């Protein structure tokens, strides 16, 4: 027999103390969603089941005890730290869920210069860790636009990526070891070593699990020397995306690793570079690190781009100014909310990836299908995209779309606009051989395509859920679709 809402709250207070169990209605409503539902949130409308409580966890031991209790009574838990998620992964879709807030677990445990790694609890803000490292002349190399908001546990749980990934890699390339708590309360640690061949890499059971398998409590990541004085900026305008993708490919294949390598189409580029884009596509690069490496990287990029006469160089100071204003902190989020409430104009992104052979077709097919098939295409005020993370064998594509919310209630905006646009992007990307999600995580709104995304490999993911969360208490509806 399931526990009542009141009984759940009482038991949680017994486990962690009354001061750590929040039942204020305003807090509960805010914790029932993430930024995927920012339009109804701005209008004060919350339609999902409100959680029974938000638990402010203070230690791994508390996480263990709380999960043990919840597992015994089959209570759904939603792990949460910085709450910068954008894909619905933090939504509470089950009645009487409990939000497991790890933001109070915010200690930097160790900065180990000799072994070039740093260990932090799940609630340490990335910006706090980064600033502590920069004071010593080092960096994580991880710099998502959410850096002022995001915390370490969520960054690892969502398999996040930073703006300098083409040089430093994504979060999975940075994580050395970690600690996590399984659904039954068992604490597991993966030790910090540079590499091993002792079976499959079990870090990857935890990295990217989105709270659907376990709760990440501590992470150790690599660190790198921080030398911003060596940064070199390059910018170009060009006529078409196909040429831009070809240039990105040549740079990667020839072995150059700029920290930033971005290609904007004309519509998306106009949003950021009105002062010089002139309605054209935009290529941006930054080289950094050891001065000799940065210089060689910059020279290599310039040489490759010079093979394409249509590309026109722009003043590097313009690119540096853009670079210095990239991140989204609390002030930008607050300003966006005011603007949305005032204008009714929404902006979202959906990021995918593909090999070099299919990425341009993905881009063109998605844009064309949205313009010709989406029934509310006339409400779209901007539709474009950019590539911002490249690899030896391919790149990502960020589809960026703004639309006016017309003739619908705030709570209807998602199903009228956002979900149908996501559907087109996911369907076209999978059809053409790409991945429907590059770095935001599946969350609860791309979960409909999880099985199609993985194909015959879905059995492996399904096996992990059965093994590590047999009672299905971990973030129901994320990664794994709810079976009806």
UniProtKB/Swiss-Prot annotation:
GO molecular function: alkylglycerone-phosphate synthase activity; FAD binding; oxidoreductase activity
Keywords annotated in UniProt: FAD, Flavoprotein, Oxidoreductase
Enzyme Commission no: 1.-.-.-
Every FAD-binding PCMH-type domain range: 47-226
Gene Ontology biological process terms, A to Z: lipid biosynthetic process
Taxonomic placement: Bacteria, Pseudomonadati, Pseudomonadota, Gammaproteobacteria, Enterobacterales
InterPro entries (alphabetical): Alkyl-DHAP_Synthase, FAD-bd_oxidored_4_C, FAD-bd_PCMH, FAD-bd_PCMH-like_sf, FAD-bd_PCMH_sub1, FAD-bd_PCMH_sub2, FAD-linked_Oxase-like_C, Oxid_FAD_bind_N
Designated gene of the protein: ygcU
Protein name: Uncharacterized FAD-linked oxidoreductase YgcU
Source domain of life: Bacteria
Family membership noted in the UniProt record: Belongs to the FAD-binding oxidoreductase/transferase type 4 family.
SUPFAM superfamilies hit by this protein: FAD-binding/transporter-associated domain-like (SSF56176), FAD-linked oxidases, C-terminal domain (SSF55103)
Pfam family, one: FAD_binding_4
Disulphide-bonded residues: none
Record-annotated membrane-spanning stretches: none
């Amino acid at each position: 027999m399931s526990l009542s809402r009141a009984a759940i709250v009482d038991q949680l207070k017994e486990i962690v103390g009354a001061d750590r169990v929040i039942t204020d209605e305003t807090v509960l409503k805010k914790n029932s969603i993430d930024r995927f539902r920012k339009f109804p949130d701005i209008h004060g409308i919350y339609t999902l089941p409100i959680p029974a409580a938000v638990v402010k966890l203070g230690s791994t031991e508390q996480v263990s005890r709380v999960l043990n209790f919840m597992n015994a009574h089959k209570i759904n838990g939603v792990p949460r730290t910085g709450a910068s998620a954008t894909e619905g992964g933090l939504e509470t879709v089950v009645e009487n869920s409990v939000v497991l807030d790890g933001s109070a677990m915010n200690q930097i445990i160790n900065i180990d210069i000799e072994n070039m790694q740093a260990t932090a609890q799940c609630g340490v803000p990335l910006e706090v860790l980064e600033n502590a490292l920069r004071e010593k002349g080092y960096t994580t190399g991880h710099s998502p636009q959410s850096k002022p908001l995001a915390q370490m546990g969520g960054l690892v749980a969502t398999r996040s990526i930073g703006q300098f990934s083409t040089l430093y890699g994504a979060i999975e390339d940075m994580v050395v070891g970690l600690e996590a708590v399984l659904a039954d309360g068992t604490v597991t640690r993966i030790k910090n070593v540079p590499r091993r061949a002792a079976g499959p890499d079990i870090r990857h059971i935890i990295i990217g699990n989105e709270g659907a398998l376990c709760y990440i409590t501590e992470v150790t990541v690599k660190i790198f020397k921080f030398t911003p004085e060596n940064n070199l900026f390059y910018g170009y305008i060009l006529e078409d995306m196909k040429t831009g993708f070809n240039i990105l490919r040549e740079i990667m294949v020839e072995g150059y690793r700029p920290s930033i390598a971005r290609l904007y189409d004309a519509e998306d580029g106009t949003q950021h570079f009105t002062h010089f884009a002139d309605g054209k596509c935009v290529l941006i690069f930054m080289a950094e690190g050891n001065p000799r490496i940065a210089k060689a990287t910059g020279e290599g990029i310039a040489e490759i781009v010079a093979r394409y006469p249509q590309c026109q160089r722009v003043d590097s100071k313009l690119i540096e100014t853009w670079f210095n204003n990239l991140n989204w902190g609390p002030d930008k989020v607050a300003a966006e909310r005011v603007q949305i409430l005032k204008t009714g104009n929404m902006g979202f992104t959906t990021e995918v990836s593909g090999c070099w052979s299919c990425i341009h077709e993905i881009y063109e097919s998605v844009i064309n299908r949205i313009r010709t098939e989406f029934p509310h295409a006339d409400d779209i005020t901007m539709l474009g995209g950019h590539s911002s993370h490249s690899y030896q064998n391919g790149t990502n594509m960020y589809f960026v779309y703004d639309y006016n919310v017309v003739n619908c209630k705030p709570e209807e905006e998602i199903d009228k606009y956002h979900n149908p646009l996501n559907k087109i992007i996911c369907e076209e990307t999978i059809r053409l051989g790409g991945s429907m999600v590059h770095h935001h995580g599946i969350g609860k709104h791309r979960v409909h395509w999880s099985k199609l995304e993985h194909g015959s490999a879905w059995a492996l993911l399904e096996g992990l859920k059965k093994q590590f969360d047999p009672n299905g208490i971990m973030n129901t509806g994320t990664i794994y679709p709810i079976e009806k």
